From Swiss-Prot:
The lineage of its organism: Bacteria, Pseudomonadati, Pseudomonadota, Gammaproteobacteria, Pseudomonadales. InterPro entries: Fe3_Rdtase_TM_dom, MsrQ-like. Part of the MsrPQ system that repairs oxidized periplasmic proteins containing methionine sulfoxide residues (Met-O), using respiratory chain electrons. Thus protects these proteins from oxidative-stress damage caused by reactive species of oxygen and chlorine generated by the host defense mechanisms. MsrPQ is essential for the maintenance of envelope integrity under bleach stress, rescuing a wide series of structurally unrelated periplasmic proteins from methionine oxidation. The keyword Electron transport applies. This is Protein-methionine-sulfoxide reductase heme-binding subunit MsrQ. Heterodimer of a catalytic subunit (MsrP) and a heme-binding subunit (MsrQ).
Amino acid sequence: MRYPWFRLAIFVVGCLFPVWWLYEAAMNLLGPDPGKIMMDRLGLGALTFLLVTLSMTPLQKLTGWSGWIVVRRQLGLWVFAYIVLHILAYLFFILGLDWGQLAVELRKRPYIIVGALGFLGLLALAVTSNRYSQRRLGARWRKLHRLVYAVLGLGLLHFLWIVRSDLREWAIYAFIGAVLMVLRIPAVARALPRVARKQGRAV
């Protein structure tokens, strides 16, 4: 296994936050509605992991270090794990497993539908994030995994629809996402290694 310590560090970070939040909930440190706080934090955690995942390719182009690409799949699976926990928190703490209430929620809060579409996209990515799927799908695999950009857009829309008024935090996530998308424009992506080489010579 390449870069085991880097992989281990990502695993520890991924586990640490939910465990810490559970500890805070057990110690009554999350206020009067700990379930909602947990749900919100897991959602933001998933969005953060998604942005970090999307930053791996630009970082590799800028630094030339292959470790960024090696952990990209692991980071993507953490996005999926956090989203699953986010949904479970919603079902348990907000709905109380009342499935009849779910239909009411979908009518009242269409941003839930947007989030569900994002989850389905992540599910497709997680299920096919293995070498067997790469071999089976061939060139279609790369096209399928461009779905991650739609997932990012749906995640940001879901977040925007929830906050509505105070957009400062959302704007930070959206700005980072926009920068990462610009870095994927072919002309910009091709220029990144040249920029890195020029900086290296300057140093």
